[in-house]
């Protein structure tokens, strides 16, 4: 396992290099890219990052394209909610 501390966490491997604000940004990205996400297909928290923008569910085996560090990018969430809202307006 790599070097880490209680406060710095996953970015403890960088030591005092690169500045505190940059390390905080990197910490947010690295924590999200290594965490498990909810699978829309099987309903379990089993989706992990395979490569940049490729996410796969360990349980059901489905593979989904997403963001580089998170499963759903903020713009994709906005587009999805807009499409859902427009679909509801046309139906009702």
Curated annotation (Swiss-Prot):
GO terms for biological process: translation. A zinc finger (C4-type) spans 39-60. InterPro entries: Ribosomal_eL37/eL43 (IPR011331), Ribosomal_eL43 (IPR002674), Ribosomal_zn-bd (IPR011332). It comes from the Eukaryota. GO terms for cellular component: ribonucleoprotein complex; ribosome. Keywords: Metal-binding, Ribonucleoprotein, Ribosomal protein, Zinc, Zinc-finger. Gene3D superfamilies: 2.20.25.30. One of its GO terms (molecular function) is structural constituent of ribosome. It holds the Pfam family Ribosomal_L37ae. PANTHER family: 60S RIBOSOMAL PROTEIN L37A-2, LARGE RIBOSOMAL SUBUNIT PROTEIN EL43Y. Belongs to the eukaryotic ribosomal protein eL43 family. This is Large ribosomal subunit protein eL43. The gene is RPL37A.
């Amino acid at each position: 396992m790599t070097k880490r501390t209680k406060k710095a966490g996953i970015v403890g491997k960088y030591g005092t290099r690169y500045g505190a604000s940059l390390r905080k940004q990197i910490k947010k990205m690295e924590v999200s890219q290594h965490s498990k996400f909810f699978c829309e297909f099987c309903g379990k928290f089993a989706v992990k990052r395979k490569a940049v923008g490729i996410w796969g569910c360990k349980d059901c085996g489905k593979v989904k394209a997403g963001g580089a560090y998170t499963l759903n990018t903020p713009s994709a969430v906005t587009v999805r909610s807009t499409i859902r809202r427009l679909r509801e307006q046309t139906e009702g």
